[in-house]
Every structure is written in C-alpha cells, then in structure tokens.
Amino acid sequence: MRGFGVHSEVGKLRTVMVCRPSLAHQRLTPANCHDLLFDDVLWVHEAQKDHFDFVLKMQERGVEVLELHDLLGQTLANQQARDFLLDRRITPNVLGSQIAEAMRPWLDEMPAAQLAAFMIGGIAISDLPEVRAKSLMLSALPETDFVIPPIPNTLFQRDPSCWIYGGVTCNPMFWPARRAETLIQRAIYKFHPIFLGGDFQIWWGDSDQPFANASMEGGDVMPIGNGTVLIGMGERTTYQAVGQVAQALFRSKAAKRVIGCLMPKSRAAMHLDTVFSFCDRDVVTLFAEVVDQVRCYSMYPKDDDGTFEIHPENRPMLDVVAEALDLPQLRTVETGGNSYQAEREQWDDGNNVVALEPGVVVAYDRNTYTNTLLRKAGIEVITIRGSELGRGRGGGHCMTCPIWRDPAY
C-alpha cells in the first residue's frame, strides 16, 4: 500500500517523482536557454540515457519512481482535469483572444499523452498548421516562436511542490519561466488516481490568486525530522512565503519548529540544497563558503491559530540543525579539493545529493573529490553521469520530489 508524507531527509525513500528529459529540452537553443533558466543546451539523447540510469538505480534500491509525463498524461484523461489545466493555460490574457479561441478546440480533442507532452514541451507555431490557418496573428509570426513556452526545468522536480511531513505545498515559483510547473503539479495532486482521496493535506499554494512577493521553491525546503523544517531564504524563496507555510504547519500541528536560513543571493547557491544536504542521520555535505554565512531564525507556534514567534539564532547553522535533531553535533563533509576544485564541484552540484536511505546517496560522477570524502566518511555513493543533466544547475536532490519517505530518528 502506497503512503504519502516525507518525514526526514535520509529515511528510507519509498516513492519519488521525477521528470525525464524530453521535448522541452530538445527545444532549448543557445538563443533561448538563458530565458528558460538553463546555462547551456543539453545533448538530449545522452541526458535521457543518464536519467534512465538514475531511475534504474533508485528502483534497484526498492524506490517506486513516478514520472511526470506519465502522471500528467493519465491525469488529462480525466475531462475535469483537462478543463482545470486548459482553463488556466489557454486564456486571452496569456495568448490573446483570437489565438486562445483558435487553439482551445484543437487541444480539447488532443489525446491525453500528446497534450501532456505539449504542456511540458511547449507549443510552437509550427505545431499548429490547422490552427494557424484560422488566425491572422499566428500566420504573421515565425514558425519557431512559442505560443506556449517549454518548461525544461520540470527536470528538477524538487521545486514546484514539496512534501512536508503529512502534506504538500504547491509552490509559487520565483521566475515566471517556471510558474506553469506548479499548475501541472496542482492538476496531478487534484485529479490523478494515485492522489485522489489520498491521506494528505495541501498545506499552501493551491490557489489561483496572485502571490505577489511570496515565492517558494522546494530546493529550499527540508523536513529534517523531529518536527522541524529547514527553509532556505536566498535567491528564490522569500520570507513572505516562509511565514505563511510556517503558519499553515503550526495551525495543523504538523511541525513544531521552522528554521528560516537566510542565505546570500547568488545563482551558484540558488537553493539551500545546492550548498547543504543530508547523507546520513548525522552526516551532511556542504559548501562552507556559503553555509558559514547563513543566519538562522527559528519560528515556534504561539497559538492554535498558527501565529508564531521568531527567535534569532546567534550561532552557526550546523549547531542550530544539530540541536533541532537532538544530536550532539553533525559530522560534515565539505566540498572536496582545493579552493578552485571545491568551487567547481559545488557549481557541478557536488553537495546536491539525494539519500535513498541512511548512509546511501546518489551523486554525479564528475565530483570526484567530494565523492571520495563522502566515502571516507562511511557514505555509500552511487554515481550517475552528470555532464548533461547538470547543465540546468541541479543534481540528484534537485531532480527528485520525494512523496513518501520514512522518519530517520
């Protein structure tokens, strides 16, 4: 029987969601990749092979792997789900009245799997020969223009939603290029048979309202156990979102402490998990240059309505996290090599590992210095190739959205 809920960062991983490289990545070009938040184009065929290897290695350890294209295709077989998604994606405000009116009947009749591929991979004008003939606006635009842009960052399933203890958040993303990802997750959680009627709550974010300055991405969120949640506040996650999530968790008594981790804002350290991740119950890997600058603020529930009080932590982040887990201290594995090598390996996601169970992680093979230090610390490191998958700045932790994970303490 499948369960729902993520109760630690290193307990036995039972169910996870991923997204394979696909049409969205085939449409990345040197001209558009930066707008779509990729640093480079992928060799898609090799990225697909490497992602398949990643999935296989998780399955060999008993992890159930759910794939986003498959989930979305199955979801869109439900007419109510199809209407939910298209009513929000195919609108005059997004496309213009004439284009929206021309496209909607075409999409309504499309097979579910093809519609799922287009919702992730984008729709170019060249995909619309019949619709284009009916629209003066479309006929005037180049065939390579996108009516609906691709969303290649679906590769990094950690971010658009995140499971925190007995529920999930649907995250309003910082950059507009990623916001359609959250709508897809909302549709899946509402309508897919796996989740329909499931024993979980949606803590926050399942709304069509504008979130203004409140943004959050799952790479910043870690339910570490013992009723504690770490949330990084750097480039992508804002205090406006953190406060609302803390309030929702406290109101439901789902957590007893939320630790906000104020980080420097930089592309290299866009999320907390790019500089800090758990490998075992008491082992973390980290990029000290950034982690040493993190300032922590603990939030505790004050009343049953979810209001909370904030306590500044005037001590290092590692001490705060160890105390929250009732540990005397954390053992640390810093990014390996000299200062040049460490900076390179952090950029290549050397600290962005995903634990399959206590003491077992998946990491990119290219980060040889850091992987060696992890093994010396007693961690089993399962490697996958990272030369293509890492071009969007994300490793094993970024590419996985755990849905069911055991406690570790």
UniProtKB/Swiss-Prot annotation:
GO terms for molecular function: arginine deiminase activity. It is found in: Cytoplasm. Gene3D superfamilies: Arginine deiminase, L-arginine/glycine Amidinotransferase, Chain A. Its EC number is 3.5.3.6. The active site is at 398 (amidino-cysteine intermediate). Signal peptide: none annotated. Disulfide bonds: none annotated. This is Arginine deiminase. It comes from Rhizobium etli (strain CIAT 652). The gene is arcA.
